[in-house]
Amino acid sequence: LFNTQVKQTKQPSTLISIVTSVGSKAKVLSTNVDVHNGVYIQSHPSNSSNVMIGGASMLSNTSLGHVLEPGDSVFLQVSNLNAIYGKSISGNSNISILGS
């Protein structure tokens, strides 16, 4: 039997707020941005194409990834934004990132 008590949690001191453009070739969404509590990834509502979100395996396999329609979002818990890749199904699209 364990008796655990949390006395304090430290909240991150910065907010991550980024909009990045992606084309039809997968790319890392941002480099060297530490994440503490996770991030929301949103396909910008004004996009005319769906986007795909995934890991580095999207570089070698174009069919991998989670599809987001314009306005859709997903919450991901990663330690750094350099673990998240994105691409547009067609043309260029914007991806919004919000987290801490």
Task: Give a label for each model feature.
Residues 1-12, 91:
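Short, low-complexity N-terminal tether/leader segments at secretion or assembly junctions of large
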Residues 10-12, 96-100:
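Positively charged, low-complexity terminal tracts
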Residues 12-35:
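Surface-exposed ligand/attachment interfaces on beta-rich extracellular proteins
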Residues 24, 36-38, 71-73:
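Intrinsic-disorder/low-complexity, polar/charged segments enriched in Ser/Thr/Lys/Arg/Asp/Glu/Gln
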Residues 33, 45-47, 78-80:
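Short loop/turn positions at the edges of beta-strands in beta-sheet-rich folds
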Residues 37-39, 77-93:
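Noncatalytic modules at the cell exterior or secretory-pathway interfaces
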Residues 42-62, 96-98:
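Short, surface-exposed beta-strand/strand-loop-strand elements in extracellular ectodomains
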Residues 67-81:
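Beta-sandwich interaction modules
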